[in-house]
Regions:
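Terminal signal-anchor or tail-anchor transmembrane helices
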Residues: 16-47, 635
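Short hydrophobic transmembrane-like helices used for membrane targeting/insertion
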Residues: 2, 14-15, 24, 32, ...
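Short, low-complexity, Lys/Arg-enriched N-terminal segments of secretory-pathway carbohydrate enzymes
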Residues: 1-19
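Non-catalytic scaffold segments within catalytic domains of secreted glycoside hydrolases
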Residues: 41-217, 228-663
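Accessory DNA-binding and partner-docking regions appended to nucleic-acid-acting proteins
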Residues: 221
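Leucine-biased recognition of intrinsically disordered, low-complexity hydrophobic segments
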Residues: 4-7, 29, 33, 140, ...
């Protein structure tokens, strides 16, 4: 007869064996899942690499003394003329403008007296094509004393991450009162006369003369919607329109022509009237009707003076930063809107839909009201950046971001375009829910990776997709924030070489607009990043000081040529600074994991110049940089084909750091 104790031991043994079997099975299943996940991501990356990262042979003849020759002075009627231009925007340059940006900048989160339990966490941020930045967490009220409270603080992340609806919070100890206050707009409250911007409204001639003296043939400017319609036209346009302001714009546009330049006019450039922001702006259909009223007013007044029309500048950037992140004025999304922003029914696609409708209606009106002889040229300025994954598991994030931002807008309005405007500033390396700062890459002051090859790749991609439309491209914005001017000069030349190479490959590009003339207010980054060919002394009556890049740009514009000598000289100066371990300003905070915060800084940190060859056609992709990929690359290195890259130069001083290229 079996004892109860024996039965108990046997039962216990069976349970243990069962648990062990379950554990082993679970471990195997986990191993299979991990293997499948890694394999799937590796397969996805391999496809991505072949499609977007494949090496290409530059069509530029680098042995020639003349590397590029744009046809700025056609000798026969059949030749296509290439134009150069300079670009700016009302919110960047106009004084006496009580727009949403001024109100946003003047708001002081430090003045709010809220108890900790009522404090709302600031929205996470996204980097933007032209300039990154936005709101920060407000400090606690004074009545909290000096005690420390524990609260949630937003971990600011990148635009492409926020498009996908991510928001992260970290728990941390934070001193309650009297801390440094972070404003909605960085580097704004700590500079002289920030509200004056560049006084383009009261004194347009200073900027116009600087532009004219470079030799450019096109001047891109905008008309501010808020200035024309300071109040919502609920009771009709008569009581809502500032006709005197409209007349003033007409005189400014006439001044552009008197300086011998054509006009490219932008109707919406990241500045929504405050009254529209109060009711929801581009989330609602009635904004389409209001925008069409604005378009009619502008067109009816200045149509005979405008050569190119840009209805919208970078609409997906505006929608993302305003309605998905709340980092720009006029959005104020709640947590549900943020979390669902990238869904098919989310606020991103909702707002983009109404903007596409608004563009189409404006396009139809401009063409319908134009005479047959005037033949208006209407398009959009579409922001593109070259995105690549940092690690093996970031390919999906890049794919999703591209699917939302790269082609959908142009697809939706493709039959209502006379040209496709491309705004390109650089590359972005996606890591999880943020942008990774790659130590071996060069960056602008505002955190944009310098990558001229990306412009070439983007132009070829867009041409392949839209060549059936038979519409040309215009580079409506390209530039770099660089106060030292050492990066800007090679940046300018290399991106123009990228454009020229694309034209050799058959991409029809009509012109190139550089951003921008003088250092100005860069959205939520304030006056931190310096994008101008001309420096501005804000403490000395906004005195202008042309940088060396101003004269280089002028030379390229007037001759239409890029020479090997000019290229070598620009690179010598940059690499001398890199070899001497010099540093320059950087207006983007970076956390311990190397992720860039999207918010700007009131005062810059210092970052060294990077000794890397990013000339057009010379940049070498280093492969994935996450620990797993680096380990695999290290293990496979003995079996890889390696070659040392030697860089030829006419100047013995220019010695570039060789990179190893591993075939993966």
């Amino acid at each position: 007869m079996v004892s109860l104790s024996s039965l108990g031991r046997r039962h216990s043994s069976v349970i243990q064996m069962t648990l062990v079997a379950l554990f082993v099975s679970a471990t195997k299943l986990a191993g299979v899942l991990v293997t499948v996940t890694v394999a799937a991501n590796a397969f996805s990356y391999n496809r991505f690499r072949k499609k977007f990262l494949h090496p290409f042979r530059s069509p530029i003849d680098e042995s020639s003394d003349i590397l590029a020759a744009f046809n700025v002075n056609p000798t026969t009627d059949g030749e296509n003329e290439f134009f150069f231009g300079l670009a700016t925007a009302p919110a960047h340059v106009e004084d006496r403008l009580n727009d949403a940006w001024l109100q946003f900048a003047e708001e002081s989160p430090c003045d709010k007296s809220e108890s900790p339990e009522h404090l709302q966490p600031a929205d996470a941020l996204m980097g933007s094509a032209t300039a990154d930045g936005g709101s920060q967490q407000a400090s606690l009220s004074n009545k909290e004393g000096n005690r420390t409270v524990k609260k949630k603080k937003p971990l600011k992340i990148a635009m492409e991450a926020m498009v996908r609806g991510f928001e992260k919070y970290i728990e941390e100890e934070e001193p309650a009162p009297n801390d440094e206050c972070h404003h909605n707009v960085a580097a704004w409250h700590n500079v002289p006369n920030p509200e004056e911007r560049l006084r383009f409204w009261s004194d347009p001639d200073t900027e116009l003369k600087l532009a004219k003296d470079t030799g450019v043939r096109v001047f891109r400017m905008g008309i501010d919607w808020t200035r024309i319609m300071p109040v919502e036209p609920i009771n009709g346009l008569k009581e809502a329109v500032n006709y005197a302001a409209l007349e003033r714009y007409q005189r400014i546009i006439n001044r552009v022509h008197l300086y011998g330049m054509k006009v490219m006019l932008t109707l919406f450039h990241h500045s929504l009237p405050p009254w529209a922001g109060e009711y929801g702006g581009w989330k609602l259909e009635k904004t389409v009707d209001y925008f069409l009223d604005f378009t009619r007013l502008v067109f009816d007044r200045v149509s005979d003076m405008v050569d190119y029309w840009v209805t919208f500048n970078e609409p997906h950037v505006f929608v993302t930063l305003t309605y998905c992140a709340g980092a720009w004025p006029g959005g104020n999304p709640d947590m549900l809107e943020v979390a669902t922003s990238a869904l098919p029914t989310g606020v991103f696609k909702q707002a983009m839909h109404w903007i596409a409708i608004a563009h189409s209606k404006a396009y139809d009106y401009i063409h319908a009201q134009s005479s047959a002889s005037s033949n208006p040229i209407v398009g959009v300025a579409h922001h593109v950046s070259f995105m690549r994954p940092y690690g093996l598991f970031d390919v999906a994030a890049v794919t999703v971001a591209n699917s939302l931002t790269l082609f959908p807008l142009v697809d939706s309005i493709s039959d209502k375009l006379d040209f496709i405007g491309i705004n390109y500033y650089g590359q972005e390396v996606i890591c999880g829910a943020g942008l990774k700062l790659v130590e071996t890459d060069e960056y602008s002051e505002s955190g944009r990776g310098v990558y001229p090859d990306g412009l070439y790749r983007m132009l070829l991609q867009f041409h392949e997709r839209y060549k059936h439309l038979n519409v040309p491209f215009i580079i409506t914005e390209n530039g770099v924030s660089d106060e030292t001017d050492l990066i800007r000069r090679p940046y300018l030349l290399e991106h123009l070489l990228a454009v020229y190479a694309a034209m050799i490959k058959g991409v029809p590009v009509l012109g190139y607009m550089f951003w921008t003339i003088s250092d100005n207010w860069e959205w939520a980054d304030g006056y931190g990043p310096k994008f101008g060919l001309v420096a501005v002394d804000r403490a000395n009556n906004l005195a202008r000081i042309p940088r060396p890049s101003y004269h280089l740009f002028s030379k390229v514009v007037t001759t239409g040529k890029i020479t090997r000598q000019e290229r070598t000289r620009a690179w010598n100066e940059l690499y001398r600074a890199a070899r001497e371990k010099k540093s320059r300003s950087f207006y983007r905070a970076v956390n311990k994991h190397g992720l860039m915060y999207a918010g700007g800084l009131d005062e810059p940190i210092q970052r060294p110049y990077v000794e890397r060859d990013w000339r057009f056609g010379h940049y070498e992709m280093e492969g994935l940089q996450d620990p797993l990929s680096c380990l695999l690359r290290f293990l496979l290195r003995p079996f890889s084909i390696k070659r040392k890259v030697k860089h030829q130069t006419d100047d013995a001083e220019l010695v570039l750091q060789p990179l190893e290229l591993s075939l993966e």
